[in-house]
Swiss-Prot record:
It is found in: Cell inner membrane. One of its GO terms (biological process) is polysaccharide transport. The chain crosses the membrane at residues 23-43, 351-371. It comes from Haemophilus influenzae. GO terms for cellular component: Gram-negative-bacterium-type cell wall; plasma membrane. This is Capsule polysaccharide export inner-membrane protein BexC. Belongs to the BexC/CtrB/KpsE family. The lineage of its organism: Bacteria, Pseudomonadati, Pseudomonadota, Gammaproteobacteria, Pasteurellales. It is a multi-pass membrane protein.
Amino acid sequence: MTTENAAIPTKKKKSFWKKMKPLFGLTVLIPTAFSAVYFGLFASDIYVSESSFVVRSPRSQSSLSGVGALLQSTGFSRSQDDTYSVQEYMRSRTALSALEQGLPLRTFYSEKGDLLSRFNGFGLNDTQEAFYRYFKERLSVDVDSISGIATLRVHAFDAEEGYQINERLLKEGESLINRLNERARKDTIEFAEQAVKDAEKNVNETAQALSQYRIKNKIFDLPAQSGVQLSLISSLKSELIRVETQLAQLVSITPDNPQVPALQMRQKSLKKEIDEQTRQLSGNGNSAATQTADYQRLMLANELAQQQLAAAMTSLQNTRGEADRQQLYLEVISQPSKPDWALEPSRIYNIIATFIIGLMLYGVLNLLIASIREHKN
């Protein structure tokens, strides 16, 4: 009786182990065997070409440390925002199109490598979008947030091809920086040039208004002309005083002197002329005083326009110099490498990782099955 009771758990244990064997083989043995065969025999070598660069700008007043201080000691500081711009550009479709114009990228990635690693190994999707997604996975651009240094890594099936892609990407990044420089310089200088054009237009308009006013009012030198008119009035008044004095003497001595009527006519004529000259000088809307105010207003407007033009031209010269000084530069710190050893795939690591993941999956499924059976019982 005791022997029979002891045999029952043994049979149950064997039955349980038999049921678990297919699950263990499915989750652990088969994936591990496939991983060992693939990574041990078929997986193609992948070479990683690496380079590093930094985008720098003329030195600012900010204080930096490390590599930033090193760049400042040479007169430049890092420009991290623009480094991120280069990073995004290198991983963009635009950069891929530029690369394909000079390198046979599809040939690099579709005619070499094993079926699982190469592009479109099973001939299912040969579109440009599929190739872009594939190439994006073979490219990495990491930026150090502290130093601002970017590291570019290109994964390829051939060391020389990876080197060529890396080198070409650096040139494309430099071209991007040059385009950004040119665009910023063009926009800045165009704004300053437009200010000069506006100032020149204002000078021409005020000068034309002043010229038309001079022609209309027959003014060539208003201060000199006003001075002549004042001198004329002064002379007329002196002449009037002389005539009045002479007339008074004649009237007191010989009232019937025939010169008296002539002097009286002369006196009347001088007074009329003095009144007319005085009226022209300051008596009506077209007087010299009014003309002087209008003339001075036009002269002031013209002088201000000339000053604005001079300031705009000075600003344009300064802007050109500043635009030249604010150029960005892509400085290559380490040139693209041409590796002689395939860093990928990590064959042993991948096999062990497959085994461990299979064990974890097996354990989870085992617990799940046991829980379901216990629930049914």
